[in-house]
Every structure is written in structure tokens, then in C-alpha cells.
Amino acid sequence: MFGQTTLGAGSVSSSASRVFRYEVVGLRQSSETDKNKYNIRNSGSVFITVPYSRMNEEYQRITRLGGKIVKIEQLVSAEA
């Protein structure tokens, strides 16, 4: 019994499979944003898909680039 847990693989994978989409406004065009794999749209809104495990890092990066997150929504897979 020592070292055993009651958590199964299903409970671990549920957080690993969660994906969220950030809607961001106010990103400045700079040498840092030029490194992105996407262009900043003319409307000013950018949609960034982020896995649950990286939400904090992505939030910090967006803030550092001068952006503001206006909406966060969870993306639901078609399998569910």
C-alpha cells in the first residue's frame, strides 16, 4: 500500500487534454511579436489556443507584450 494512489489514468489525462482559447487585444507590433507564427489581425483581436498546462506562461507572455485578454473559453472536443 505504501506509495500507491487511488488516482487512475483517466483523472490525470482530463487536465492534460483541456485546451482553451484566449481572445487578446492590444498587442503591439514589435520585434517580439514578429517571432509569432501568426500575424496580428487588423481588427486588433488575436485568438490564441493554449493547453491547460501552459495557461499561466501564456498569460504572462501576453501581458509582457502589452496585450489584454478579453475572453477565455474552453474548447470542447467532438469526441465528448
Curated annotation (Swiss-Prot):
> Any idea where this protein resides?
Cellular thylakoid membrane
Q: How does it sit in the membrane?
A: Peripheral membrane protein
User: Residue ranges of the CpcD-like domain?
Assistant: 17-75
Matching entries from InterPro entries are given as: Allophyco_linker_chain, CpcD-like_dom
Recorded hits in SMART domains, A to Z, give: CpcD (SM01094)
Q: Quick one: where is this thing mainly located?
A: membrane
What is the purpose of this protein? Rod linker protein, associated with phycocyanin. Linker polypeptides determine the state of aggregation and the location of the disk-shaped phycobiliprotein units within the phycobilisome and modulate their spectroscopic properties in order to mediate a directed and optimal energy transfer.
- Name listed for the protein in its UniProt record: Phycobilisome 8.9 kDa linker polypeptide, phycocyanin-associated, rod
This protein's encoding gene: cpcD
